[in-house]
C-alpha cells in the first residue's frame, strides 16, 4: 500500500482547492443549498481552523478540519472528504483520529459535527469512532437532511 501521510497544511494550495471543489460538487448533488453548511477556503485558512491534508505517495487524496470554538470548549469536524479512488484504505479513519488528536492538544472537551443523512458510509465511520447522535448545536437549526453527532474527548 502506498505511503499515506496526514499533516496540517494550508487549504489554499491548488491541489487542495481542487479537492474542496470536488467535495462541493458532491455535496451539491446530494443536498439543496440551505442544507449545505460549508466553510469556504478563506474561512478554512483562519487561525481557529486546523486544516489537515491526507496525501498518498505525495498526492492529495483527502482532507478534514476542526473549527475550534474556544468559548464552547468544543471543536467542530468540517470538510471531511476522501477522493472516491482513495477510499477503502482507512484514510478517513486516520483523518478523523488526527482531528481528535488536534482537538485534545487544543484542550477541547468534545468534538461535534453535522453531516448529511444520505452519507451512510461517513455516518458509519463516525459511529464506529465513538460519535453519538445529538441535537443541533451552535448556528444549526433542525434540518431533516442533517444528522448531528458528538464525541466526548
UniProtKB/Swiss-Prot annotation:
The record's listing under InterPro entries reads: Acyl_CoA_acyltransferase, Bact_Acetyltransf, GNAT_dom
Q: Which domain of life is it from?
A: Bacteria
Q: Which PROSITE patterns match?
A: GNAT
GO-annotated molecular function: acyltransferase activity, transferring groups other than amino-acyl groups
Signal peptide per UniProt: none
Print the keywords alphabetically.
Acyltransferase, Transferase
Q: What is its EC number?
A: 2.3.1.-
Q: List the Pfam families hit by this protein, alphabetically.
A: Acetyltransf_1
What are the N-acetyltransferase domain coordinates in residue numbering?
4-153
Q: What does this protein do?
A: Participates in the tryptophan-dependent indole-3-acetic acid production, which is a phytohormone released by A.brasilense.
Name used for this protein in its record:
IAA acetyltransferase
Q: Which species is listed as the source?
A: Azospirillum brasilense
Amino acid at each position: 500500500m502506498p505511503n499515506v501521510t496526514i499533516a496540517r497544511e494550508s487549504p489554499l494550495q491548488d491541489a487542495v482547492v481542487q479537492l474542496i471543489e470536488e467535495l462541493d460538487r458532491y455535496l451539491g448533488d446530494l443536498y439543496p443549498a440551505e442544507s449545505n453548511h460549508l466553510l469556504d477556503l478563506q474561512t478554512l485558512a483562519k487561525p481557529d481552523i486546523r486544516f489537515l491534508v491526507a496525501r498518498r505517495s505525495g498526492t492529495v487524496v483527502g482532507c478534514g478540519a476542526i473549527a475550534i470554538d474556544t468559548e464552547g470548549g468544543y471543536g467542530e469536524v468540517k470538510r471531511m472528504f476522501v477522493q472516491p479512488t482513495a477510499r477503502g484504505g482507512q484514510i478517513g479513519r486516520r483523518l478523523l483520529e488526527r482531528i481528535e488528536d488536534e482537538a485534545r492538544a487544543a484542550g477541547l472537551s468534545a468534538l461535534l459535527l453535522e453531516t448529511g443523512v444520505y452519507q451512510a458510509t461517513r455516518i458509519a465511520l463516525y459511529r464506529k469512532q465513538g460519535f453519538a447522535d445529538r441535537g443541533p448545536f451552535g448556528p444549526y437549526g433542525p434540518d431533516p437532511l442533517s444528522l448531528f453527532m458528538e464525541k466526548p474527548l
